[in-house]
Amino acid sequence: MQIGAATEGVEADLSVNAEPDVKPIAKMLSACVGSVITTLTVTPLDVVKTRLQSESISQYSSTQPISSAKILGKGRPAPKPLGGPVSGLYQIARHEGVRSLWRGLVPSLTMLLPANTVQFLGYEQLLPLYSDWGFPAAAAIAGASARTISATIVSPIELFRTRVQAVGGHYPPGHAREIANEVFDGLKLMIHQKGILNLWSGVSVTLWRDVPFSAFYWWSYERIRLFLLGHPSLQAFSSSQSTKDLYINFVSGGISGTLATLLTQPFDVSKTAKQVHGHTLTRGQFMLTLWKRGGPKALWKGTLPRCVKVAPSCAIMISSYHLTKKYFSESVDAY
């Protein structure tokens, strides 16, 4: 096939072929290690991003978040608006406690461990298949396919995590149990009124954000990686191939994650609106309403904290995954 011939040279250097293959259990453990490191690092940035978006949506909406309605009804004051991503970290740490920056850590881990495992294993299984079939942009198609599966699996967990982070500012420090109970009560009421399938209420918006994100991320990651592999300055960077690989994966993941974030930010804002406020509006109606009331700025609210979160998240995840997988490949007798 002509397409396959045109892409053969490129596909031969894809990341999935750059290191010895390991058994699925080693890949799963590698994905889990990367997920834990990434989550511990970027959860504070995710808390700030969710709070900023929730505040913006409340500003342009006449309704309160579902899971915080009863809280505010009890007379609890709304949290002071955050000034921005950097000052937001300081404000939350000062007024709600440093531990509040890791609010939603457990559901984040519960969500990311299976999500990243499915994502990375799925990508590595599908990429050679699509490449053999001669698909153009095989990396984009493989990334989008793997992300569709993983996002659907973890959507209810992400819904819970998003609401925990959004309403946490209505409680003083040290009330994690009360926050979780309040969110659980809101979810139970939602299931009773609208059915259990509403736990996937944000999955369509999540897919609209994550599928294009993953497609562009994996496509650009493979291309940036190939560019860095052939760059002359890299040859003088380090004599160790492991160090070079770590650098290439880290930089490629960070740049690709940033570019993909800029493209998909409006979908992230509409996803947060859907999960936090529980509107019956469609994705398009959400985005149109925000555009009319706040302009383009409303649709790209939280772009900086999301970029600050996603760039290191992608860089850490992809580099730690390949580094851990390389370790397992050198310890093949144990696996």
Curated annotation (Swiss-Prot):
Pfam families named among the record's database cross-references: Mito_carr
Protein name: Uncharacterized mitochondrial carrier P23A10.06
Membrane topology: Multi-pass membrane protein
Membrane-crossing residue ranges in chain numbering: 28-48, 104-123, 133-154, 195-219, 246-263, 307-323
Per-repeat ranges for Solcar: 22-129, 134-227, 244-327
GO terms classed as biological process: glutathione import into mitochondrion; import into the mitochondrion
Protein family: Belongs to the mitochondrial carrier (TC 2.A.29) family.
GO molecular-function term, one example from the UniProt record: glutathione transmembrane transporter activity
Keywords, comma-separated and alphabetical: Membrane, Mitochondrion, Mitochondrion inner membrane, Repeat, Transmembrane, Transmembrane helix, Transport
Compartments reported by the entry: Mitochondrion inner membrane
Domain of life, per lineage: Eukaryota
Entry annotated with the keyword GTP-binding: no
Main localization of the protein described in the UniProt heading: mitochondrion
Cellular component per GO, a single term: mitochondrial inner membrane
